[in-house]
Amino acid sequence: MAGFMKNAMSYLGMSDVVDDEDDYIEEDEEQKPASKSAFDSDHTVTPLASTTAPAASSTTKPFPGGRVNRITTIHPKSYEDAQLVGRALRDGVPVVLNLTGVAEAVAYRIVDFSAGVVFGVRGSLERVTPRVFLLSPAQVNIKVEEPTKPASAHDLFAD
């Protein structure tokens, strides 16, 4: 126990540094020199043939490019429906995610999953309303305009 206290006090800077290495002095034993034949050999090393990366598998599809010709609207009923979001974004289709019919805890899980998918495809996620989101893949650019608030109720319908 005294050794522990010495080490603790030394660690906290309350005493001199304990040098435990001096406690265990071993007698120098005669060491046999290693045989030269163990390290030097006449065997030659044959280099391996360089390998190239395997070609892309036939199941891999290139990421779709070009114009977007459809948008998918998803109204999930449970967390299991979140995979529909992942499939659509993987295929390059923008998704409108409407969470109005889902419990709040499930909606948070779906948004979390969807945000991960959007990150994975390098896309973007925009909140349209508190429970409706627009998720778009990388090749789709979304222009977000901040709505201007009317000065008064009379200006609400003014052109």
UniProtKB/Swiss-Prot annotation:
Residues 23-69 are annotated as: Disordered. It is found in: Cytoplasm. GO terms for biological process: division septum assembly; FtsZ-dependent cytokinesis. Its main location: cytoplasm. Disulfide bonds: none annotated. Gene3D superfamilies: SepF-like protein. The keyword Cell division applies. Pfam families: SepF. Belongs to the SepF family. Cell division protein that is part of the divisome complex and is recruited early to the Z-ring. Probably stimulates Z-ring formation, perhaps through the cross-linking of FtsZ protofilaments. Its function overlaps with FtsA. PANTHER family: CELL DIVISION PROTEIN SEPF. Homodimer. Interacts with FtsZ. This is Cell division protein SepF. The lineage of its organism: Bacteria, Bacillati, Actinomycetota, Actinomycetes, Bifidobacteriales.
